[in-house]
């Protein structure tokens, strides 16, 4: 059970990182 929770949290963190990177790249292109 602990392995599943740690895997899900890692997936969630990587998703947030990708989303932030995507937003930053879009803002750079807009400027």
From Swiss-Prot:
Subcellular localization: Plastid, Chloroplast thylakoid membrane
Cellular component, GO annotation: chloroplast thylakoid membrane; cytochrome b6f complex
Residues that span the membrane, as ranges: 4-24
Superkingdom of source: Eukaryota
Signal sequence residues: none
Similarity remark: Belongs to the PetL family.
Quaternary data: The 4 large subunits of the cytochrome b6-f complex are cytochrome b6, subunit IV (17 kDa polypeptide, PetD), cytochrome f and the Rieske protein, while the 4 small subunits are PetG, PetL, PetM and PetN. The complex functions as a dimer.
Stated name of the protein: Cytochrome b6-f complex subunit 6
Species this protein is from: Chara vulgaris (Common stonewort)
